[in-house]
Amino acid sequence: SSAASDVYKRQVPLSAIDLIKNNLLALATEEESGSKGSGQKPVTVEAAYAQWQRILNLLGDNPANQERFLRYYWNAFEPVKASDGTRNFATKSNLIRLYESYLKNGVRPFLENLEIGAEAYSAALGEPSELISQKATTAMKRLQRAQGAPGNVLLLYLIVNKGTLDLTDEELLTIVNQLTAFFVRRNITGRPSTSDLQRMFRDIVRQISGAACETRISEIVGDRLLKVSADDLLFREALSGPIYTDNADMTRFILASLAEANMTNESFSDLWARTSQQKRPYAWSIEHIFPKGENIPESWVAMMGGAEQAQKALENHVHKLGNLTLTANNSSLGNRSFEAKKNHKNSSGHYIGFRNGLSINAPLVAIDQWDANRIIERTEMLVDDLVRMYSLESIAGSAGRP
């Protein structure tokens, strides 16, 4: 059968996902032949295989993502308690053993629970879902773009238990926004360390499951996140440094959030639209206003006030937030002069330089001069905006509290 044969086709080391599937199909075979009964009508091997494939389809085809789901699922629900009462925390190394113990409950409950979990996890990744509101889906997509994946342990638990927890769409949305603000600070400052995050979210889940009904879940989440969040001083310092070299992906995210904050339906641009190119995955990319190459073009040497000043700016300011923006198809801007970057058009006559309609570029269009002082000024202004946008209050969730 397809179930048995595709396990043996590949001569590569089996992943955790493959090994767990093998255990599942072996148990389904035993149950079906009647040598091992769980008291329920057994699931056929074919049906078990089909349901397993459905679960994987919900998770997408990246094996690392599939494995991450199994870890997060275990840490959110801890489906099997250890006999001596110790709590097992799922890691890459013990995953197969933990899921072996989970399978002992029988194939049917294992697959049913896992499929419910996979549906919730898919919703947490921002895939279209009936389980949550459209607004929450949009917010969850944003959280993933802010590299907030470790928060999915909590979201998985909340989406599966939305009904029993009496969690409204509105409060779920607040929690996703709290997580986004937390992860923006975390990923820009590096605090708290990545290794602490998994256990922290597992503990938040435990706290919620043991809390009195009248406690607002967003308050539990906010209080825990605030205890470990980077303060404003640290956040400012990290935002004011060579942010592009420290974390280009997060730089792209915060530039996009600054631009998105002022978008209306009429002026909407999808800054996350994908291209088919490996090198430039996004249609909109980060543009250095003062070019980042070692050979400074003549027009820029003049604009910076001479060779020495230009070299200093290259060493000290080129990768700072104030010198960065977003443009579409930026390969064609590169070393052009400031004037040309402002007014550049594509072959069909549309502005694709700084006159591209994004609010973060409007101030650039209004000036004729760009130098180190301008970079410093614009950095300070954007940092102020970001500290407000991802404030400690928004992590506390207090912005949405009555």
Please describe what each predicted stretch is.
Residues 2-7:
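Short, small-residue-biased leader/transition segments that mark boundaries at the very start
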Residues 15-18, 330:
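Glycine-rich, histidine-containing beta strand-loop boundary motifs that form or position
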Residues 17-20, 26-261, 389:
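A cross-family structural signal marking well-folded subdomains
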Residues 18, 23-24, 29, 147, ...:
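Solvent-exposed, flexible loop/coil residues
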Residues 22, 27-50, 305-332:
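Charge-dense polyanion-binding interfaces
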Residues 166-188, 231, 343-402:
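C-terminal, well-folded lobe of enzymatic/effector domains
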Residues 214-364:
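Betabetaalpha-Me/HNH-type nuclease active-site subdomain
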